[in-house]
Curated annotation (Swiss-Prot):
It comes from the Bacteria. The active site is at H42, E69, H190. Keywords: Cytoplasm, Pyridoxine biosynthesis, Transferase. This is Pyridoxine 5'-phosphate synthase. Homooctamer; tetramer of dimers. It catalyses: 3-amino-2-oxopropyl phosphate + 1-deoxy-D-xylulose 5-phosphate = pyridoxine 5'-phosphate + phosphate + 2 H2O + H(+). 3-amino-2-oxopropyl phosphate binds at N6, R17, G191, G212, H213. The gene is pdxJ. InterPro entries: Aldolase_TIM, PyrdxlP_synth_PdxJ, Pyridoxine-5'_phos_synth. It is an enzyme of class 2 (transferase). GO terms for molecular function: pyridoxine 5'-phosphate synthase activity. 1-deoxy-D-xylulose 5-phosphate binds at D8, H9, R44, H49, T99. It comes from Chloroherpeton thalassium (strain ATCC 35110 / GB-78).
Length: 236
């Protein structure tokens, strides 16, 4: 299982003082040199962490895979087409939320997703949908032309009861198996950390996990390189 590192909170720390450091581009390079298979950044509409200039520099420097998380808006689509990330992940976005709170409602937005994804594909940009691990969402992801699904692990990460954890892992397993059956590539993310990620390894259909906050928090104490290497060891 591979590791993609979300570097949003390097930018959060930088922006807390409106300074130039720490630099998310440097952090991304260190993550790659330490074995990360990809870099994830979320260009939010309010630009609360990653800025447009960060995205431009990341596109110019990332050597593995650049995954741009973004809301499904005209502005973001234009930015994606101009920047040409290796992957676009469509996520829900609310200005008042601290972090993404759930999967994209692909069922009610199905008719909007089809032309949106098609235009990105016409420019050579594959699309991933950040979704809840349900058969209905996976079916729609197939129908609208997504190449990937990112299964939302937020509920799993919050559970405490072993019985509930096992039930959620089974739900993730069933979703991943169905997605794979439909020809989708499967990744997972949200709320994963150094304590709960090992269990996700059991789901063989998940080829990569996207981890941000927990890894960046660890990096503030022990450095980016060691934080990345430690997570990779857990995934192997």
């Amino acid at each position: 299982m591979r590791l993609a590192v979300n570097i949003d909170h390097i930018a959060t720390l930088r922006n807390a003082r409106q300074e130039t450091q720490p630099d998310p581009v440097t952090a991304a390079r260190l993550a790659e040199l330490s074995g990360a298979s990809g870099i994830v950044c979320h260009l939010r509409e309010d630009r609360r962490h990653i800025k447009d200039r960060d995205l431009e520099l990341l596109r110019a420097t990332v050597q593995t895979k650049l995954d741009l998380e973004m809301a499904m808006t005209k502005e973001m689509k234009a930015i994606a087409i101009k920047t040409k990330p290796d992957l676009v992940t469509l996520v829900p976005e609310k200005r008042q939320e601290l972090t993404t709170e759930g999967g994209l409602d692909v069922i009610t937005r199905k008719d909007d997703l089809i032309p949106y994804i098609d235009e990105l594909q016409q420019h050579g940009i594959p699309t991933s949908l950040f979704i809840e691990p349900t058969p209905e969402a996976i079916t729609v992801a197939t129908e609208v032309g997504a190449a990937f699904v990112e299964l939302h692990t937020g509920k799993y990460s919050l559970l405490k009861s072993p019985k509930e954890i096992e039930a959620e892992l089974l739900r993730l397993q069933d979703a991943a198996s169905l997605a794979k059956k439909f020809g989708l590539r499967v990744v997972a993310g949200h709320g994963l950390n150094y304590e709960n990620t090992a269990e996700i390894k059991r789901i063989k259909e998940i080829e990569e996990v996207s981890i941000g906050h927990a890894l960046i928090a660890r990096a503030t104490l022990m450095g980016m390189s060691e934080a990345v290497k430690e997570m990779i060891r857990l995934l192997q």
